[in-house]
Amino acid sequence: CFISDCAPG
């Protein structure tokens, strides 16, 4: 996950 992309994947 990244700064504003904390999703399962």
From Swiss-Prot:
What residue range is the signal peptide? none
Give UniProt keywords alphabetically.
Amidation, Disulfide bond, Hydroxylation, Ion channel impairing toxin, Secreted, Toxin
Gene Ontology cellular component list: extracellular region
Q: Which tissues carry this protein?
A: Expressed by the venom duct.
4-hydroxyproline sites (modified residues): 8
PTM sites of type Proline amide = 8
A molecular function annotated in GO for this UniProt entry is: ion channel regulator activity
Subcellular location field: Secreted
Q: List the disulfide bonds.
A: 1-6
Q: Does the keyword Isomerase apply?
A: no
Q: What does this protein do?
A: Its target is unknown, but this toxin may modulate voltage-activated calcium channels (Cav) or calcium-dependent potassium channels (KCa).
What the record says about family reads: Belongs to the O2 superfamily. Contryphan family.
In the record's own words, the domains note is: The cysteine framework is C-C.
Quote the protein name from its UniProt record: Contryphan Le925
